[in-house]
């Protein structure tokens, strides 16, 4: 039987974005600005919700958790990528790659599940307003979020352990700007059919099930809104849901394009663009979507900034 020499891979080379060195430096500055905007914008959401007692409701509790996840989400990939481009060091250790993969999968799934819970929260608020307080009490919301964190960590751990058991003997060059599932599977010289099955089975369950729940929730919401006779009531219901629906379309549309569509051995530019959209652009736009189109958030933000200004003048 023919024996094949296997080289133990101790590090990977992240090629980054498919562009020239000069363009990559410009993109690194752009992504750093996007990262700072994402971090500051989402921190502002968390601070505003914590400051204004009128925002201490399940809807804004979930929104503050989403803002926290978005900060962690972008922090998993962007700082490492910017440092690699600016220093010219494109390598990442095997352990570092698995760590990045674990947290990335955790946060992307948490984002998905939180969007689902927020859709259900809007469904209860609009379709069953009299039962809203009983169904969405604070204790239940905390337990729900804690359960979601547990599920996402277990799912990420499953993928990380499966990747750690693969052999990498042909190449250690990752055609991507961070350690993601598809590029790592394409590098492996092991049989990855089980990994692919897990991605489509378990990953699909955690990604598509929330999407179905969101679609069902909004279907019931829109049917209820059509029955509202008051024009003002309809406008308020639509404005409440439009922010969340915009985020859902942006996040799910790009994420599904990456993980549930055929990919080539070298990640095409379209996949890279889709990854940037849901991992960088969506978290950056969320604060603007939720603050500029939400009266309560704008009012709370104005109150907080006004109090900070008065405090500084004293």
From Swiss-Prot:
An annotated Gene Ontology molecular function: G protein-coupled receptor activity
Membrane topology (Cytoplasmic): 50-57, 121-139, 220-236, 293-314
Keyword list, A-Z: Cell membrane, Disulfide bond, G-protein coupled receptor, Membrane, Olfaction, Receptor, Sensory transduction, Transducer, Transmembrane, Transmembrane helix
PROSITE patterns (alphabetical): G_PROTEIN_RECEP_F1_1 (PS00237), G_PROTEIN_RECEP_F1_2 (PS50262)
Record field: transmembrane: 26-49, 58-79, 101-120, 140-158, 196-219, 237-259, 273-292
Chief place where the protein resides: membrane
Gene Ontology cellular-component terms listed: membrane; plasma membrane
Any Pfam family the entry gives: 7tm_4
Family according to the record: Belongs to the G-protein coupled receptor 1 family.
Function: Odorant receptor.
Protein name: Olfactory receptor 1C1
Species this chain originates from: Homo sapiens
Lineage: Eukaryota, Metazoa, Chordata, Craniata, Vertebrata
